[in-house]
């Protein structure tokens, strides 16, 4: 199964900004690795939550569309809420 998500570049940093994103149904994430600089991004929580239920989400290359540019990534780390079925943060590594 091929996964493709639209992402926005994240400019606001910090705990308060991250909490506001999560309250609005979005999730903060970061893309790093390769020769490019790390990029903080924002993704839709519901799309990711549904996709992460599939086993292949963790092993396949995922396509992120950031500012109209496609980036091939793999999930490096994922933080979940301790008791709610919510994602808190995701780290992606460029493939």
Swiss-Prot record:
Q: How does it assemble?
A: Part of the 50S ribosomal subunit; part of the 5S rRNA/L5/L18/L25 subcomplex. Contacts the 5S rRNA. Binds to the 5S rRNA independently of L5 and L18.
Q: List the GO molecular function terms.
A: 5S rRNA binding; structural constituent of ribosome
Name of the protein in its database record:
Large ribosomal subunit protein bL25
Protein role:
This is one of the proteins that binds to the 5S RNA in the ribosome where it forms part of the central protuberance.
A GO BP annotation: translation
GO CC annotations, alphabetized: cytosolic large ribosomal subunit
Which domain of life does the UniProt lineage start with?
Bacteria
Question: PANTHER family of this UniProt entry?
Answer: RIBOSOMAL PROTEIN L25/GLN-TRNA SYNTHETASE, ANTI-CODON-BINDING DOMAIN-CONTAINING PROTEIN, RIBOSOMAL PROTEIN L25_GLN-TRNA SYNTHETASE, ANTI-CODON-BINDING DOMAIN-CONTAINING PROTEIN
Gene assigned in the entry = rplY
Q: What CDD domains does its record include?
A: Ribosomal_L25_TL5_CTC
Q: Which stretches are transmembrane? A: none
User: Which NCBIfam families does the record cross-reference, listed alphabetically?
Assistant: PRK05943.1 (NF004612)
Per the record, the similarity remark reads: Belongs to the bacterial ribosomal protein bL25 family.
Entry keywords, A to Z: Ribonucleoprotein, Ribosomal protein, RNA-binding, rRNA-binding
InterPro entries registered for this protein in UniProt: Rbsml_bL25/Gln-tRNA_synth_N, Ribosomal_bL25/Gln-tRNA_synth, Ribosomal_bL25_short, Ribosomal_L25_dom, Ribosomal_uL5_bac-type
Query: What's a Pfam family in this record?
Result: Ribosomal_L25p
Gene3D superfamilies given in the database record: Ribosomal Protein L25, Chain P (2.40.240.10)
């Amino acid at each position: 199964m091929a996964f493709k998500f639209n992402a926005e570049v994240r400019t606001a940093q910090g705990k308060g900004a991250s909490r506001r994103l999560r309250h609005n149904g979005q999730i903060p994430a970061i893309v790093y690795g390769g020769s490019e600089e790390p990029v903080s991004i924002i993704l839709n929580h519901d799309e990711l939550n549904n996709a992460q239920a599939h086993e292949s989400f963790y092993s396949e290359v995922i396509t992120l569309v950031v500012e109209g540019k496609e980036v091939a990534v793999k999930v490096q780390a994922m933080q979940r809420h301790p008791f709610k079925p919510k994602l808190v943060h995701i780290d992606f590594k460029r493939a």
